[in-house]
Amino acid sequence: MKGLLLLLLLSVMPVQAEQPDIQCPGQNTVERRFCASQKWEESNQALKEQLEPRSLKTWMKATQEVCAAAYAPYRQGTIYPQMVVSCDDRLNRVLLEELKGLGE
């Protein structure tokens, strides 16, 4: 009975997810995808602080379309998502540099 009670209590206790221990740029496809998405999240957050929501939405749509077209030959491969996310990040960072230049 105690074992059942313990099992019941463990099943309702909150579990805290830990961030994976990955050293970027990563050693395999999964790790590289993770690293690429982390970099994209950083550049995307920086753009959110610089652009109006409407401009950001337009920018994101354009970069997604351009990057998807640029890497279309790899669409069936496991590396495709990483390449598209990395492309989005690179374009974001170029725009951030341009915006920085305008503010000086």
What do the predicted segments below correspond to?
Residues M1-L7:
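Sec-dependent signal peptide recognition
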Residues V12-P14:
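N-terminal signal peptide c-region/cleavage motif recognized by signal peptidases
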Residues Q16-E104:
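N-terminal alpha-helical modules
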